[in-house]
Regions:
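Membrane-integrated ABC transporters
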Residues: 1-37, 58-63, 82, 86, ...
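An intracellular "coupling" helix at the cytosolic face of ABC transporter transmembrane type-1 domains
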Residues: 14-22, 107-111, 127-136, 140, ...
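Transmembrane helix-loop-helix hairpins at lipid-water interfaces of multipass membrane proteins
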Residues: 21-78, 160-163, 276-279
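Helix-loop-helix
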Residues: 51-66, 156-170, 248-314, 319-320
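Cytoplasmic coupling helices
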Residues: 84-103, 144-145, 168-213, 220, ...
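ABC-type nucleotide-binding domain
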Residues: 336-553
Length: 553
């Protein structure tokens, strides 16, 4: 994780506001006007009291009461508009950030996401992004409002006596800057530790739910629950510490405000006693300071409340700014069709662990190429390289007599269908799960693909047929049924090159025969690379290649 200062995180998050600058300016102006209205309600009360006791200070009682009534009326409207603008900005930007994060994950996938903690990713996508609402709705405009309010009130108090203006400035600096800086140092790492622990807890819970059958089978439920409670307690302790700091912040802020008011009262009283300041002006200056701490108090609270938000922002920025292993290829000469593939002297390693070494293979058009080998020999890795999910360390891979690095990514995806060993299913109907491979596919096309995958009859036996929901991760289906949905996707995609990784490993011999027959029939206008351990599956191959220790043998 890249370590950024809070200022750097703040600057990068503010840049995202640019498309909504108009709404942000409206929120600041409405907020400024609203706070001024609230403050001058009290100040006008002071003018009215002074007029009532015969010490006219420039505004009569009648005028003060009329203006105060108008300010009270408009205060509610201004506050509503300010909050509406702030939350419109916040929710629009949260949607934009989610879109950017999903685009970044798509760009990083699969090379940077293989082995990544999925629970932590879910935590970033959900709760971390949601925490940014505090920054966009309750931080940017309040900071600007506090800055502008400080200037206005210093000028107003200072016009009675410049010495009182200096006292007001010192009070605002203490409450709005010194206290947040002091408190933020005390809770410096709390926010990041809380977000990290929350992500780890989310991952632990997700793993526990997915592995629930194994946990129950091996009687690990109690042990797993104890670990979950331990992690939860540790997270709660961290949150309690942050809340304790927030409590200190509130107490310190209140004490400084009380001290500032007292000093202002004493200074104004002393000047009044010495005859350098009129009593009415002294009273108005004290009232003005006492009623003006609202905006800067909001700044004081940021020292503790923003630690979680900045930590969340840092985690979100990690995803947005992470560089992908593979960049999409665009703007190259189109590759209209698949005319064969070739790998020459390819080397590839996963994090310095050699997988393929001097690997070469030719894949002629309209043939079925079988690939066999022990687990870990590099068979599946070769298919991923053909999909350009990874970059080779050495050697070349050609598609249609072009280097794979020069083929437009859209052309490559159109020409290739890839079925992995584990079929990922979504909590949706069978129809929509198959349609993933071709979003505009007709129902007839989906049914034909399912027939080729020996899935059609099974689907019709279900109460809701093709509209049957498969459950989360396809947990209502057997391994073989999930695998056949993956095959149906590959058939529906109708690509020139089919890359099938163990397509029949979970199937009985009857379903295997139906699928192999369908693949053989597809051979006239398709090329198939078939990875399997089964000798029966390899019978349809025109050529069988053996991979051993990352080499052809």
């Amino acid at each position: 994780m890249k370590k950024r200062s809070n200022v750097a995180v703040c600057r990068k998050l503010i840049v995202l506001v640019r498309p909504l600058t108009g709404f942000m300016l409206a929120a600041i102006l409405m907020g400024l006007a609203g706070h001024l209205a609230a403050m001058f309600l009290t100040i006008l009360g002071g003018y009215a009291i002074l007029d009532a006791v015969g010490s006219y200070a420039g505004v009569g009682m009648k005028t003060a009461l009329i203006v105060a009534g108008l300010l009270a009326f408009f205060r509610g409207i201004l506050r509503y508009v300010e909050q509406a603008c702030n939350h419109y900005i916040a929710f629009r930007l949260l949607a934009l950030i989610r879109s950017k994060v999903f685009a970044a994950l798509r760009r990083l996938c699969p090379a940077k996401l293989e082995g990544r903690d999925k629970g932590n990713l879910i935590s970033v996508i959900t709760s971390d992004i949601e925490l940014l609402e505090v920054f966009y709705a309750h931080t940017i405009s309040p900071v600007a409002i506090a800055f502008l309010m400080t200037i206005v009130m210093i000028c107003y108090i200072g016009h009675f006596a410049w010495q009182l203006g200096i006292l007001a400035l010192l009070a605002y600096l203490l409450v709005g800057i010194a206290i947040p800086l002091f408190i933020s140092k005390q809770s410096k790492n709390d926010g990041m530790q809380i977000r990290t622990q929350a992500g780890e807890l989310s991952s632990f819970v997700l793993d526990s739910l997915r592995g629930l059958p194994e946990i129950l089978q091996y009687r690990q439920g109690e042990k797993r629950l104890e670990e979950m409670n331990r992690r939860t307690d540790r997270l709660m302790e961290q949150e309690a510490h942050l809340k304790s700091v927030a409590g200190k912040n509130t107490g310190l802020t209140g004490a400084v405000i009380l001290l500032s008011d007292t000093v202002m009262l004493l200074a104004a009283g002393l000047m009044c006693k010495n005859g350098t300041l009129d009593f009415s002006f002294a009273l108005l200056a004290v009232i003005a300071l006492m009623s003006s701490f609202g905006p800067v108090t909001a700044l004081a609270n940021l020292g503790s409340t923003l630690q979680n938000t900045f930590a969340a922002g840092n985690r979100v920025l990690d995803i947005l700014e992470e560089e992908p292993v593979i960049e999409e290829v665009t703007g190259r000469q189109p590759t209209p069709s698949f005319e064969g593939a070739k790998a020459e002297h390819v080397d590839f390693s996963y994090e310095k662990e050699p997988i393929l070494s001097d690997f070469s293979m030719e894949i002629p058009k309209n043939q079925i190429i079988g690939v066999i080998g022990k687990s870990g020999s590099g068979k599946s890795t070769f298919l991923k390289l053909l999909m350009r999910f990874w970059q080779t360390d050495a050697g070349t891979i050609q598609i249609s007599e072009k280097s794979i690095d020069t083929v437009n990514t859209t052309d490559l995806r159109r020409m290739e269908s890839y079925m992995t060993q584990e079929t990922q299913l979504f909590h949706d109907s069978i129809t929509n799960n198959v349609r993933v491979a071709k979003p505009d596919a007709s129902m007839e096309e989906i049914e034909n693909a399912c027939k080729k995958a020996s899935l059609h009859d099974f689907i019709l036996s279900l109460p809701k047929g093709y509209e049957t929901a498969v459950g989360e991760l396809g947990d209502t289906l057997s391994g073989g049924e999930r695998q056949r949905i993956g095959l149906a996707r590959a058939f529906l995609h109708d690509a020139d090159l089919m890359l099938l990784d163990e397509p029949t490993s979970n199937l009985d011999s009857l379903n295997e025969g139906v699928i192999l027959k369908a693949l053989k029939e597809e051979q006239k206008d398709k090329t198939v690379v078939l990875v399997s351990h089964r000798e029966s599956t390899m019978r349809i191959a025109d050529c069988v290649c053996s991979v051993e220790n990352g080499r052809m043998s």
